[in-house]
């Protein structure tokens, strides 16, 4: 949009825990992506919606698979949280138990993702890293982050994030080579992941 001088350009850009460049401080997901391809992901993660549900037969990345993958990244802390919840209920600490329930009500609220969107995202972000390599296209044109010269950029990361490691979101600032430093801001929250 900046390259075209579009009136639809955003007033600012804010990225929250976004894997802008997984080659920066690579973690488990980046290592796995190094040997994955579209066909492997398709075989393992893409499933048809069961016949008894609306959308039957549509290919999706099931929310339950995503939830299992999320939980497996920090399984020990989830187990500890569930044990603590049981103890809180047993000992009558219902305020703490309610906080647990509120968190997991939201955490467990995952939806199926269309196969097309999921596969395209995996390919562009994790397998091919098209944005940091300057290969990402939109409507047939290469995305040119160097054209961004006056749109403030703000990145936010969690220091303990085990999915988007610290620095991967901040890397967005490196793509905007013509954006003045005073328009680039980053924040890392300690203890959050």
List the predicted regions and their residue ranges:
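Short, conserved loop/helix-junction motifs that constitute active-site signature segments
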Residues: 7-8, 145-150, 176-181
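Active-site nucleophile elbow and catalytic-triad environment of alpha/beta-hydrolase enzymes
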Residues: 126-145
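C-terminal structured domain segments across diverse proteins
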Residues: 122-123
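Short acidic (Asp/Glu) and glycine-rich catalytic loops that position anionic groups and cofactors
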Residues: 97-103, 151-152, 189-190
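Short beta-strand/loop motif that positions the catalytic acidic residue
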Residues: 148-150, 154-157, 161
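Alpha/beta-hydrolase-fold enzymes
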Residues: 2-116
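Conserved alpha/beta-hydrolase "acid-adjacent" motif
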Residues: 162-171
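Histidine-bearing beta->alpha loop at or near hydrolase active sites
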Residues: 159, 186-193
């Amino acid at each position: 949009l900046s390259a075209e001088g579009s009136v639809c350009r955003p007033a600012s850009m804010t990225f929250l825990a976004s894997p802008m460049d997984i080659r920066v401080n690579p973690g488990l997901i980046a290592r796995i992506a190094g040997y994955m391809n579209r066909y492997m992901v398709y075989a393992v993660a893409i499933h048809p919606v069961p016949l008894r549900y609306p959308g039957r037969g549509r290919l999706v990345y099931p929310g339950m698979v995503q939830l299992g993958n999320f939980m497996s990244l920090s399984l020990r802390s989830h187990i500890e949280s569930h044990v603590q919840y049981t103890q809180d209920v047993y000992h009558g600490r219902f305020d703490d138990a309610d906080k647990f329930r509120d968190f997991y009500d939201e955490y467990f609220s995952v939806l199926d993702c269309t196969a097309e969107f999921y596969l395209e995202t995996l390919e562009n972000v994790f397998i091919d890293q098209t944005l940091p390599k300057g290969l990402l296209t939109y409507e047939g044109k290469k995305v040119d982050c160097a054209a961004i010269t006056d749109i403030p950029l703000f990145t936010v990361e969690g220091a303990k994030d085990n999915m988007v490691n610290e620095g991967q979101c901040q890397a967005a600032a490196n793509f905007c080579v013509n954006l003045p430093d005073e328009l680039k801001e980053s924040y890392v929250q300690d203890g959050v992941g």
